[in-house]
């Protein structure tokens, strides 16, 4: 766990496919009064088609998507909201791109093993991301250990526990 040195403006719930970004993001929103922004909704159709076909996205595929996510979070902040974005943010350069768009951005990294992620993806109904892409996600992952405004949590804990922990960490950054 890393403590926040300065106030966190918004959160990104990050990690590989199957780590629980959507359910944890919703729980953090519930515990913090924030607004969940589901990053997958902003993928262009071509990205969804590639992932559905088991083809990993390239940095180029993600570029416009990351720009759009940064704009959405910045807009939410301008409207006085407390945004919580779900986004894999696997590489440092992706996180830096989001940080450039949103000053004070914090990250909650849902850390888990490849085996657990694969099992979760294999048993997740109705999602476009196949379990076959988990290996490529771990290959691309640059864990954010030691990065500023980053909370690392064990993603095998209960959603309730993670949501409360992350919301408290966020609030603590705001009050000093």
Q: What are the residue ranges of the model-derived segments?
A:
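Conserved substrate/cofactor phosphate-moiety recognition/catalytic segment
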Residues: 26-71
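Conserved phosphate-donor/acceptor-positioning beta-strand/loop module used by diverse small-molecule
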Residues: 102-121, 153
């Amino acid at each position: 766990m890393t403590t926040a040195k300065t106030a966190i403006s918004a959160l990104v719930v990050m990690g590989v496919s199957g780590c629980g970004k959507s359910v944890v993001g919703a729980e953090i929103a519930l515990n913090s009064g924030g607004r969940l922004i589901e990053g997958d909704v902003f993928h262009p159709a071509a990205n969804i088609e590639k992932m559905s076909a088991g083809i990993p996205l390239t940095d180029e595929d993600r570029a416009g998507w990351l720009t759009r996510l940064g704009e959405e979070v910045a807009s939410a902040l301008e409207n006085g909201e407390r945004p919580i974005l779900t986004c894999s943010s696997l590489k440092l350069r992706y996180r830096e791109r989001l940080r450039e768009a949103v000053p004070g951005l914090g990250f909650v990294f849902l850390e888990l093993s490849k085996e657990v992620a694969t099992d979760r993806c294999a048993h997740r109904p109705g999602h476009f991301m196949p379990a076959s892409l988990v290996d490529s996600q771990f290959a691309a992952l640059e864990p954010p250990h030691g990065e500023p405004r980053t909370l690392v949590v064990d993603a095998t804990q209960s959603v309730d526990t993670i949501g409360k922990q992350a919301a408290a960490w966020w609030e603590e950054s705001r009050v000093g």
